[in-house]
């Protein structure tokens, strides 16, 4: 049983559920009702949360539901370090209202800044706090494995961190509560609160950018797993004969075969050894390709691009089929630029239909939130 719990963890669950009883909080964290009551009492005294309503009694005392006190809570500064090489910054309220947002392309930062991304985040926080003294909390979203209870970034394949103790570092420096979360789990919360899964009990969010990750909502709860590593779909080995090495050290991972980076590398390599493609001139001019170039090749039905992308969709279908077979979701939300292509979506569905069980009934669709998903994932 867990002995200690931070107020920020309680707030996160109250925000996620909208209204939640002390008993539900105790069950969520594996704590006694007395311990939960002690923490919630502090939050009630600070007027950060309020007793919103009384539920129906099942024989004993009726449950009292707690919710966030939007009027009391100060502004939240959110920083989202995504897998698509973009840094999204938002300033808003805990109820999801955003009144300031901007984004920074990671590739436009200097080499030193890219190698010390926490300093970049630190500079942003310092600047925003100096301009807005009403900021009362920080929310940091990052790719990879996150232990939000300890406030630690266990492993981020896309960012170099000088210290994994992200929460401790920023709480000490700014004397503000700091929430830390994995990027795809944050996306799942957004889809659950304002997206296509508001009334869906069981769903999967599958994110494809430079890397691949997923988040699973089971019976309306975001599932994290024993080590807070549930959802590492990118590291499912789907090609045991592969020579492509993944960032995790294994070969044949879904991420190494079908992420944006993997797709670009494959097509670039094929062009360089002499394979024909309409992207050859683009590669020669820019010396690199982007996922937009790949989608242009798909639109023009370039043979090489279609060949590589069809294989990528086949591997993605294999990975999704494993998730479908194990989790039996009602809906799958796809996040990533490649899913904007109807041709690729049709190809993915075709490949899934070939291997998935007929008894599985589910909807699969790209997120309807577009780029706003990254801004709201704070």
Placement of each model-derived feature along the sequence:
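ATP-binding/phosphotransfer module of carbohydrate and carboxylate kinases, centering on a glycine-rich
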Residues: 1-61, 65-105, 109-134, 250, ...
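Glycine-rich phosphate-binding loop and adjoining helix at the ATP-binding site
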Residues: 102-202, 343-354
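Glycine/GP-enriched mid-protein hinge/lid loop-to-helix segment characteristic of carbohydrate kinases
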Residues: 101, 113, 173-296
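Residue-level signal for well-ordered, solvent-exposed loop/turn and beta-edge residues enriched
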Residues: 96-97, 152, 221
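Short, active-site-adjacent cap segments at secondary-structure transitions
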Residues: 57, 145-148, 186-188, 213-214, ...
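Short, acidic, Ser/Thr-enriched surface-loop or helix-capping motifs
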Residues: 93, 148, 217
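Short glycine-aspartate micro-motif
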Residues: 76-80, 135-139, 203-207, 213-215
């Amino acid at each position: 049983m867990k002995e200690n719990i931070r107020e920020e963890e309680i707030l996160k669950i109250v925000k996620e559920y909208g209204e939640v009883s002390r008993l539900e909080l105790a069950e969520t964290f594996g704590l006694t009702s007395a311990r939960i009551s002690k923490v919630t009492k502090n939050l009630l005294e600070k007027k950060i949360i309020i007793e919103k309503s009384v539920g129906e009694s099942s024989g004993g005392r009726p449950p009292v539901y707690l919710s966030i006190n939007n009027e009391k809570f100060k502004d939240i500064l959110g920083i989202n370090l995504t897998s698509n090489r973009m840094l999204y910054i938002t300033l808003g309220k805990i109820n999801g209202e955003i009144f300031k947002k901007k984004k920074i392309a990671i590739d436009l930062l200097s080499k030193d800044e890219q190698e010390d991304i926490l300093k970049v985040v630190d500079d942003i926080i310092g600047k925003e706090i100096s301009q807005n003294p009403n900021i009362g909390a920080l929310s940091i979203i990052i790719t990879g494995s996150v232990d939000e209870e300890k406030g630690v970034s266990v492993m981020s394949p896309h960012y170099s961190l000088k210290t994994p103790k992200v929460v401790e570092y920023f709480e000490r420096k700014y004397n503000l509560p700091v929430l830390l979360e994995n990027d795809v789990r944050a996306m799942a919360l957004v889809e659950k609160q304002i997206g296509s899964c508001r009334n869906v009990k069981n769903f999967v969010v599958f994110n494809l950018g430079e890397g691949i990750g997923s988040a699973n909502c089971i019976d309306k709860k975001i599932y994290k797993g024993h080590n807070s590593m549930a959802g590492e779909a990118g590291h499912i080995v789907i090609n045991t004969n592969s020579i492509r090495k993944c960032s995790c050290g294994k070969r044949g991972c879904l991420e190494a075969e079908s992420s944006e980076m993997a797709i670009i590398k494959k097509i670039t390599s094929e062009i360089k050894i002499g394979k024909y493609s309409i992207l050859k001139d683009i590669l020669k001019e820019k010396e690199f390709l982007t996922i937009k170039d790949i989608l242009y090749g798909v639109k023009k039905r370039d043979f090489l691009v279609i060949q590589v992308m069809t294989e990528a969709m086949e591997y993605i279908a294999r990975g999704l089929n494993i998730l479908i077979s194990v989790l039996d979701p009602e809906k799958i939300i796809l996040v990533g630029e490649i899913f904007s292509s109807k041709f690729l979506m049709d190809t993915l569905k075709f490949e899934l239909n070939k291997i998935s069980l007929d008894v599985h009934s589910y909807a699969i669709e790209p997120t309807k939130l577009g780029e706003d998903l990254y801004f709201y994932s704070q």
